[in-house]
Amino acid sequence: MNDLTITLKQAAKEMEFDLTENQTLAFEKYYNLLIEWNKNINLTAIIEPKEVALKHFIDSLTCLKILEIPCQANVLDIGTGAGFPGIPIKIFRPDINVTLMDSLNKRVNFLNEVIKKLGLTNICAIHDRAEDFGQKKEHREKYDYVLSRAVAKLKVLSEYCLPCTKLDGYFISQKGPDIDEEVKEASKAIEVLGGSLLNIHKLQLPFINDGRSLVVIKKVKQTPSVYPRKAGIPAKKPIA
């Protein structure tokens, strides 16, 4: 048994995730593809098996500790990069529908290869800008859960994610340990975009002193049609 598998199984047990053998094999295939493609395109700086198991795979699953996502729920991962958190969640929860969105076509090509090689179904990867994606009728307020892992500051991320979140759905931002000031700065944006801060869950990744914060925002009213604004504007002029 290799380092990735040993660490993954131990950490999953610690976090009370019951991984099957097929799911473990899927994570191994995912890791091998990640390392292979990372030689040619910049997917991740984290490549050691133990670190990938903890800081990518297990970290991606942490939101499942705080939310009971129902069968057939529609989940969107904005700014997914190399597929985190969306692909690990799909491996562990094959019963949900996952959409991965990223602004770089090379990364989307990688995601499609992973989907194909792992034989994943009811999952797709889309090449788009978050600002454009959220204005499209087929995506606007269509997702039960919108996830994003440390893509931008929360006040910017909210403008990317809340327009795609269904009324009474949830936007979950996966962040590092020191999040309080960032949440405070985002309070106006969250309100304007139709969200309400529900909770901030703090946790530690197993075996390493690495804290995480999961910011849970509920969609309580429709997002005004002017949001998200045109590409580049949310980052340059965040709602304040």
From Swiss-Prot:
Signal peptide: none
Domain of life of the source: Bacteria
Cross-referenced InterPro entries: rRNA_ssu_MeTfrase_G, SAM-dependent_MTases_sf
Subcellular location: Cytoplasm
The keyword Cytoplasm is assigned to this record: yes
Segments crossing the lipid bilayer: none
Keywords associated with the record: Cytoplasm, Methyltransferase, rRNA processing, S-adenosyl-L-methionine, Transferase
The enzyme's E.C. designation: 2.1.1.-
UniProt GO MF annotations: rRNA (guanine-N7-)-methyltransferase activity
One Gene Ontology cellular component annotation held by this UniProt entry: cytosol
Positions annotated to bind S-adenosyl-L-methionine: 79, 84, 130-131, 149
NCBIfam families: rsmG_gidB (TIGR00138)
Function comment: Specifically methylates the N7 position of a guanine in 16S rRNA.
Family: Belongs to the methyltransferase superfamily. RNA methyltransferase RsmG family.
Protein name (record): Ribosomal RNA small subunit methyltransferase G
The species this protein was found in: Desulforamulus reducens (strain ATCC BAA-1160 / DSM 100696 / MI-1) (Desulfotomaculum reducens)
